């Protein structure tokens, strides 16, 4: 456990950020999962709507620093490719 005042503050900030980042990452995974369900059911209209939402959430997650921007680009590219194949 941290002893110095600044180290205690850092530990507190890290915990708050960890919780926030986990929430963002979970939201991203849930949106991707819903898109994959739409792809599996072969409903193109639903998949396109959910792709738009997924791209938005993935880009936001990357801009917040939760995931790397290249990882975000790769996820978007792969999801777009699957939706376009419908």
UniProtKB/Swiss-Prot annotation:
SUPFAM superfamilies: Ribosomal protein S20
Bias-annotated ranges (Basic residues): 1-11
A Pfam family matched in the record: Ribosomal_S20p
The organism's place on the tree of life at top rank: Bacteria
Gene Ontology terms for molecular function: small ribosomal subunit rRNA binding; structural constituent of ribosome
Record keywords: Ribonucleoprotein, Ribosomal protein, RNA-binding, rRNA-binding
Keyword rRNA-binding applies: yes
GO cellular component: cytosol; small ribosomal subunit
Gene Ontology BP terms: translation
Sequence segments annotated as region (Disordered): 1-27
InterPro entries hit by this protein: Ribosomal_bS20 (IPR002583), Ribosomal_bS20_sf (IPR036510)
Cited function: Binds directly to 16S ribosomal RNA.
NCBIfam families: S20 (TIGR00029)
Membership in a protein family: Belongs to the bacterial ribosomal protein bS20 family.
Name of this protein: Small ribosomal subunit protein bS20
Organism: Syntrophobacter fumaroxidans (strain DSM 10017 / MPOB)
């Amino acid at each position: 456990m941290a002893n110095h005042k600044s180290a205690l503050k850092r530990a507190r900030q890290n915990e708050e950020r960890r919780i926030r980042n986990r929430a963002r990452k979970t939201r991203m995974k849930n949106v991707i999962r819903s898109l994959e369900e739409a792809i599996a059911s072969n409903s193109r209209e639903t998949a396109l709507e959910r792709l738009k939402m997924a791209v938005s959430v993935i880009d936001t997650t990357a801009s917040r620093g939760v995931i790397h921007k290249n990882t975000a680009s790769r996820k978007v590219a792969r999801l777009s490719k699957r939706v376009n194949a419908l």
